[in-house]
Amino acid sequence: MRVAQVVRNTSETQISVKIDLDGTGRQKLATGVPFLDHMLDQIARHGLVDLDIEAHGDTHIDDHHTVEDVGITLGQAVAKAVGDRKGIRRYGHSYVPLDEALSRVVIDFSGRPGLEFHVPFTRARIGTFDVDLSIEFFRGFVNHAGVTLHIDNLRGVNAHHQLETVFKAFGRALRMAVELDERAAGQIPSTKGSL
């Protein structure tokens, strides 16, 4: 079973993440940031990973620390659940539309953190959620999961649709990348022999 639990406690946030990479999309989400919960639900459902995330943060200031630290802790949990990366497909990609919006996400479990985030948001907020926090979420994730991640919103007018397609595509790309390839069982997916 590829499961992991990570707890992160700082002076700003207290976060617990449990993940099962071979789940069915079940989720229990309580971050204190409703729109973030909605986006994390997309990862669980479209990535077919089970997620249990609880966060308490200094949201009386703003949502920045909570959103970023959930990304960090989720990245740590994914890295722990994937382990030595033997037998995984390593690469994943997905295109996801939602009405007028279309996004592409490509991920590489390379061991080299990197983020290319290109989303020309059409507004600064979705309800009370600051769209800039999505960058902080994914930056925290890649730095602690050890992945390279390319995110491109190819078109979109509605900012909610833009970001929802990003999170759905991320879930599907993650699912593809961590899937076990029976033809490569026990092998590191690299000609170098390590990641």
UniProtKB/Swiss-Prot annotation:
* GO biological processes: L-histidine biosynthetic process
Q: In which pathway does it act?
A: Amino-acid biosynthesis; L-histidine biosynthesis; L-histidine from 5-phospho-alpha-D-ribose 1-diphosphate: step 6/9
Matching Pfam families: IGPD
Catalysed conversion reaction: D-erythro-1-(imidazol-4-yl)glycerol 3-phosphate = 3-(imidazol-4-yl)-2-oxopropyl phosphate + H2O
Domain of life of the organism in this record?
A: Bacteria
EC top class named in words: lyase
Keyword annotations: Amino-acid biosynthesis, Cytoplasm, Histidine biosynthesis, Lyase
Location in the cell: Cytoplasm
EC number annotated for this UniProt entry:
4.2.1.19
**GO MF terms on file?**
imidazoleglycerol-phosphate dehydratase activity
Family note: Belongs to the imidazoleglycerol-phosphate dehydratase family.
PANTHER family, per this entry? IMIDAZOLEGLYCEROL-PHOSPHATE DEHYDRATASE, IMIDAZOLEGLYCEROL-PHOSPHATE DEHYDRATASE HIS7
Report what the protein is called: Imidazoleglycerol-phosphate dehydratase
Source gene? Answer: hisB
